[in-house]
Amino acid sequence: MIEIKSVNKVFYQGDKQIHALKDINLFIPQGTIFGVIGSSGAGKSTLIRCVNMLEKPTSGQVIVDGVDLTTLSNPQLCAARRNIGMIFQHFNLLSSRTVFENVALPLELAGQSQQHIETKVTELLALVGLSEKRESYPANLSGGQKQRVAIARALASDPKVLLCDEATSALDPATTQSILELLKEINRQLNLTILLITHEMDVVKSICHEVAIIGGGELVEKGTVGDIFAHPKTELAHQFIRSTLDLSIPEDYQVRLQPTRVAGSYPLVRLEFTGATVDAPLMTQIARKYNIDVSILSSDLDYAGGVKFGMMVAEIFGNADDDEAAIRYLRENNVKVEVLGYVL
């Protein structure tokens, strides 16, 4: 459905070149919810704007439903964009128009009949759960309701693709979840291909089938959500996975942490478990095998793409050789171990 082939985007500031995208290659199948995640400035918003030619790539191809958008004239591109809906972090509703009139706007601009507009908008407002708000104005809506109006408006032309650029970033957690559930339902009902840009791994975990991770304008890693969470290959992937599990070090431990081992200290470790390692009794194994004690300060477990993953912060009590042997054993069994320091 969407093919991004060797896409590069360069911005110019005087004599300075800024490479926002570097040789990006992605394929997004029909009916997929595909997430692109990256930190601020990674290039993800530039990428999504290239998909509908709001930003024209410096080089490369963007093929949507078999049509290479980079080769189209302006009138042809305008017609092709009717197959691509888009929603943003900010809702961009017209304050002087009612909910009904905001959703109807693309249909009016396309020259549709009043009968078609009435039928279509009524159907869309029912889909997004806003039938009773049709005569309300944006000022009287919550943030979540405004985003629902924006979604209905984006679907007015029956697009085959919906682009979501940080669509939940301005919403509270409960409202974010309701919007994500709505997008999942729309994907199921309409078989709509959704390309979703976010900096939050929780959003990817909740809704996406596949994900690509972008850093510094480059494609760092891609795959199914289950594969990325079960077998992250890069440090950036580990960082985003870690962000979904909030395991901070207690303050009293932070002040006692030493960078190197000294007499009377013991290691404080952060362990990341993915895939099969989540269910393996590794902590009891190392306790018995190496004659050490393990004190778990905090732990968390979650699911993404049908795969369990978890994290733990723990203290290891033993002599230096046994501690190191236990850490090696965990790493040999595909547990990512980070020694945070040594508690004195």
From Swiss-Prot:
SUPFAM superfamilies: ACT-like, P-loop containing nucleoside triphosphate hydrolases. This is Methionine import ATP-binding protein MetN. Keywords: Amino-acid transport, ATP-binding, Cell inner membrane, Cell membrane, Membrane, Nucleotide-binding, Translocase, Transport. GO terms for molecular function: ABC-type D-methionine transporter activity; ATP binding; ATP hydrolysis activity. One of its GO terms (cellular component) is Gram-negative-bacterium-type cell wall. Residues 2-241 form the ABC transporter domain. InterPro entries: AAA+_ATPase, ABC_MetN_proteobac, ABC_transporter-like_ATP-bd, ABC_transporter-like_CS, ACT-like_dom_sf, MetN_ABC, MetN_ABC_transporter-like, NIL_domain. ATP binds at G38, S39, S40, G41, A42, G43, K44, S45. It holds the Pfam family NIL. It catalyses: L-methionine(out) + ATP + H2O = L-methionine(in) + ADP + phosphate + H(+); D-methionine(out) + ATP + H2O = D-methionine(in) + ADP + phosphate + H(+). It is found in: Cell inner membrane. CDD domains: ABC_MetN_methionine_transporter (cd03258). Part of the ABC transporter complex MetNIQ involved in methionine import. Responsible for energy coupling to the transport system. It is a peripheral membrane protein. PANTHER family: AMINO ACID IMPORT ATP-BINDING PROTEIN, METHIONINE IMPORT ATP-BINDING PROTEIN METN. It comes from the Bacteria. The keyword Aminoacyl-tRNA synthetase does not apply. Belongs to the ABC transporter superfamily. Methionine importer (TC 3.A.1.24) family. NCBIfam families: ABC_MetN. Its EC number is 7.4.2.11. The complex is composed of two ATP-binding proteins (MetN), two transmembrane proteins (MetI) and a solute-binding protein (MetQ).
